[in-house]
Amino acid sequence: MVRIAYLGPEGTFTEAALVRMVAAGLVPETGPDALQRMPVESAPAALAAVRDGGADYACVPIENSIDGSVLPTLDSLAIGVRLQVFAETTLDVTFSIVVKPGRNAADVRTLAAFPVAAAQVRQWLAAHLPAADLRPAYSNADAARQVADGLVDAAVTSPLAAARWGLAALADGVVDESNARTRFVLVGRPGPPPARTGADRTSAVLRIDNQPGALVAALAEFGIRGIDLTRIESRPTRTELGTYLFFVDCVGHIDDEAVAEALKAVHRRCADVRYLGSWPTGPAAGAQPPLVDEASRWLARLRAGKPEQTLVRPDDQGAQA
C-alpha cells in the first residue's frame, strides 16, 4: 500500500488535489484501493514524513496565482535530504466563509484562516467582516475545526471541510480574483523521473558563488538553448546573511537534449545544483524546448564515422555555373 502524507486534516484543498492525482493515474503504483492517506499538520511535516520513511510520497501546495510561491514548501525542498517531484495538478480555488449553524455575520468577532487562504480573500474580509480578529490556522480544514470546537466564530475554509464539520456558510465562492488557482505537487524520494510527455516541467535549486555576473551567466545557459524559464525565485540559504538559493523552473524534461545540456552547463557554473525533478504538467506550461538540432546531428555523424555533408556556398554555385 502506498502511503501519502498531505497537508491536513481531512477536507483541505490538498486532499482534493491528491484525489485528483490518484484519479488521473499520476501516483506511481497505486489505485484508490491501494492508498493510505496520512493527514499531517503542515507541508514541511508531509515532506519530513517522506524523508523519515513514514510515507512514500507527500502531496503539498507549491504555488498559487494570488500570493505566489508557498514558501514553507520551497524551503523544505531546498534543505535536508534531497526529494524529487513526480507529478503536479492545479485546482481552481474558491473559499467558503463558515460559522456554526444558526449564527450570522453579526456574531463574528474572531475568524480563523490559513495564511495562504487569508491572502486570497483579503479584500472580501475587509469589505464584509472588517472588525473580525484574524487568527492563524494550520490549514483550511484546521480553520473549520476551530469553528466546530468553539475556538473562533468563523473561518475561511474549503466547501469540503465545511461539510465535514457540519458548518453553515455565510458566503460561498469567495475569492478576490476570479482566476485564483493553486498548484500542488507530489514529492517522493529520488528515483527515475516519469517518462517525457512533451508537456513537462523541470525544476532545480541553484547555489551560485557571489561573483559579478554569476547569476546572469547561469541563467543564460537556458536562454541560449531556447529553453523557456517559467519561474526564477530567490530564497535565503539560512546559513549566512546575504546569501541566497535560486529556484528555477523551465519547460521541458531532463530527457530533452536542450534541457539536459543546460543542466550540465549550469552544474559546471554553480557551487551546487539540486535537481528537483522532471514531471508532466498536462497542458503545456510554455514554449517547448527545441528538438535535436543540426549541430547535434552533425556531432552524431562524426561519432559514427560517417562522412560530413559538404556545404555549398552561393559563390561556389555561381562559379560552377
Swiss-Prot record:
Pathways per UniProt: Amino-acid biosynthesis; L-phenylalanine biosynthesis; phenylpyruvate from prephenate: step 1/1
Regulation affecting activity:
Allosterically regulated by all of the three aromatic amino acids (phenylalanine, tyrosine and tryptophan). Inhibited by low concentrations of aromatic amino acids and highly activated at higher concentrations. Ionic interactions are required for optimal activity.
Q: Which keywords are on file for this protein?
A: Allosteric enzyme, Amino-acid biosynthesis, Aromatic amino acid biosynthesis, Lyase, Phenylalanine biosynthesis
Cite the GO molecular-function annotations of the record: amino acid binding; prephenate dehydratase activity; protein homodimerization activity
What are its E.C. numbers? 4.2.1.51
InterPro entries cross-referenced by the UniProt entry? ACT-like_dom_sf, ACT_dom, Chor_mutase/pphenate_deHydtase, Preph_deHydtase, Preph_deHydtase_CS
A GO BP term, please? L-phenylalanine biosynthetic process
- Cite the PANTHER family for this sequence: PREPHENATE DEHYDRATASE P PROTEIN (PTHR21022), PREPHENATE DEHYDRATASE-RELATED (PTHR21022:SF19)
Q: How does it assemble?
A: Homodimer.
Query: What else does UniProt say about it?
Result: Was identified as a high-confidence drug target.
- Domains: entry comment: Both domains are absolutely required for activity. In the absence of the ACT domain, the enzyme not only loses its regulatory activity, but also its catalytic activity.
Q: What is this protein called?
A: Prephenate dehydratase
Q: Which organism is it from?
A: Mycobacterium tuberculosis (strain ATCC 25618 / H37Rv)
- Gene transcribed to yield this protein: pheA
